[in-house]
């Protein structure tokens, strides 16, 4: 803090950027709140235009492979690409960004909830039905809590029903929505070429 105050006094334009889970680790080790002294900037997945300009992708490729620039060089070897997404992105996000930084009593349940969310992405699924499909699920509050963690990690969201009645919104069944379509594709057995010739599956 002394060095920071000194740089500020000397009008030295210094900015410190914490990316990924490091911002959460910093908050855990602080005795101060840093109120008014930091700004959160959301850096989401790459858009179609960005992936098109950088790698020449078309719309179908973007729908299947998603907006992860780090995996773009692997799409010609889809088995390797799927392992990269599962191991380097999904597993790392759950194991490090969530499990190491927050208290999760049932990590296996959270992983199964994520897999279920990928399977039902774009669909509404009640918490009661989730309890029926997930072993040792506990209660709906636990599932809702874990779903919020997955949303914060940029993996899976549970979109609430849009209504002017706040009570009905809070009590509504969530609509699963993955943050990136690659999270679904990496769990499917089909390749990009195989899925695009199946109108029922491709949509």
Show the residue positions of the predicted features.
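Alpha/beta-hydrolase-fold catalytic nucleophile elbow
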Residues: 19-20, 179
């Amino acid at each position: 803090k002394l060095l920071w105050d000194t740089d500020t006094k000397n009008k030295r334009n210094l900015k410190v950027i914490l990316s990924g889970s490091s911002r959460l680790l910093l908050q855990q080790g602080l005795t101060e709140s840093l109120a008014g002294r930091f700004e959160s900037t959301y850096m989401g997945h790459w858009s179609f235009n960005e992936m098109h300009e950088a790698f020449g992708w078309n719309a179908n490729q973007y729908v299947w492979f998603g907006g992860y620039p780090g995996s773009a060089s692997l799409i010609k070897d889809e088995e390797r690409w799927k392992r990269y997404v599962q191991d380097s992105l999904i597993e790392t996000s759950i194991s490090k960004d969530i499990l190491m930084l927050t208290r999760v009593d049932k990590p296996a349940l959270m992983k199964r909830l994520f897999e279920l969310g990928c399977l039902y992405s774009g669909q509404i699924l009640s918490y009661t039905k989730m309890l029926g499909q997930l072993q040792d699920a506990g209660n709906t509050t636990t599932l809702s809590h874990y779903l919020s963690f997955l949303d914060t990690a940029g993996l899976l969201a549970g979109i609430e029903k849009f209504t002017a009645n706040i009570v009905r919104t809070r009590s509504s069944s969530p609509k699963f929505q993955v943050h990136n379509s690659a999270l679904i594709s990496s769990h499917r057995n089909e390749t990009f070429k195989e899925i695009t010739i199946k109108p029922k599956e491709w949509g």
